[in-house]
Amino acid sequence: MRKIIINGGKKLQGEVTVSGAKNSVVALIPAIILSDGVVTLDGVPAISDVDNLIEIIEVMGGSVKRDGETLEIDPRGVKDMPMPFGKINSLRASYYFYGSLLGRYGQAIVGLPGGCDLGPRPIDLHLKAFEAMGASIFYEGEAMRIATDAGQRIKGAHIYMDTVSVGATINTMLAAAKADGRTVIENAAREPEIIDVATLLNNMGARVRGAGTEVITIEGVESLHGTRHQVIPDRIEAGSYIAMAAAIGKGIKIKNVLYEHLESFICKLEAMGVRMTVEEDAIFVEEQGDLKPVDIKTSPYPGFATDLQQPMTPLLLKASGRGKIIDTIYEKRVNHVPELARMGADIQVLGGQIVYNGPTQLSGAPVKASDLRAGAALVTAGLMADGQTEITNIEFILRGYSNIIEKLSDLGADIRLIED
């Protein structure tokens, strides 16, 4: 079993560069199946989710070359076949293969997706969209087959999303890119990652308009070609390092940051009194003085991102006073709370809300990462704490934070990954 060991209490200083967006690349790689030529991605993060997606593409017959942060994928050999269930079941974003395989072959046979356990994340919206486009759904054991009649080309449709969903919006875009006719998505999600996927599709020859707004229109085309695409910076990784820098830094510059992707998050930091300077593509976070408590309520983009409430929680514990966190997106995103309490935090879950009272001096302790962003919170807490913190279940952390051990070590952290 692998663990992360942190000897905390050291102030961090220096520069850290944000990697490409995890939540983009896990959709971009399946999207490439739609291409009739080679596609190159630049800025690909070194995370286990990418490793798993590469393996899936290769098992299906595609060719992949990797050189550092550059990924070259030739999807022309990809076969119409059942997906490798083991990798699919461990990876929530595997559901993006539904849309891309439907668009290419008129059917997809896949295992049900896995990932972090954050409460209900039904794929009903995805399936409703596919059915509106002429597909039928069949359950076969632990797998699901989504298919048009006799593998015919999927049809364009007018689709209204009952709730705002990033995954369903992207999946519908993927299926619609090569559909017969026009697809309109109303009440679409607006996240930057959706714009990134639409940009790749358009560079491949698709006709997607309105990405980043509530209405997206896709005119289906018969074929897509190869291209080269730069993955956008990871706004969640950026926010995680910004919060970490405010909590335990004495001057840290976070590079490769797009401020416009983080406005609601940065507004909360400013309300706390966090001192920072926004540059063209970077944010410099100073060493902090006294901080004020704030209340946080997550909401779909451009609101406060659910993926940032856990990484920000340790910073909130430095504020003088009481505050609360309400996650309206994922109801079970509270599993970091008992772990922080084990480290001495005055924090608890009351009536579905996280209530904290600070400031708190944390102490090192053995803790367990229950999901990706909870793991990021525990890393920050370990850096803040007096003494040694041992984090287990770290595979979640490695799923989403590229080279996190090396990046923190370069800032002066006493952190290491060990095999037990």
Curated annotation (Swiss-Prot):
It is found in: Cytoplasm. Pathway: Cell wall biogenesis; peptidoglycan biosynthesis. Its main location: cytoplasm. Its EC number is 2.5.1.7. The keyword Repeat does not apply. Phosphoenolpyruvate binds at K22, N23. One of its GO terms (cellular component) is cytoplasm. Keywords: Cell cycle, Cell division, Cell shape, Cell wall biogenesis/degradation, Cytoplasm, Peptidoglycan synthesis, Pyruvate, Transferase. InterPro entries: Enolpyruvate_Tfrase_dom, Enolpyruvate_Tfrase_sf, MurA_subfamily, RNA3'P_cycl/enolpyr_Trfase_a/b, UDP_GlcNAc_COvinyl_MurA. One of its GO terms (molecular function) is UDP-N-acetylglucosamine 1-carboxyvinyltransferase activity. Pfam families: EPSP_synthase. It comes from the Bacteria. HAMAP family: MurA (MF_00111). This is UDP-N-acetylglucosamine 1-carboxyvinyltransferase 2. It comes from Streptococcus thermophilus (strain ATCC BAA-250 / LMG 18311).
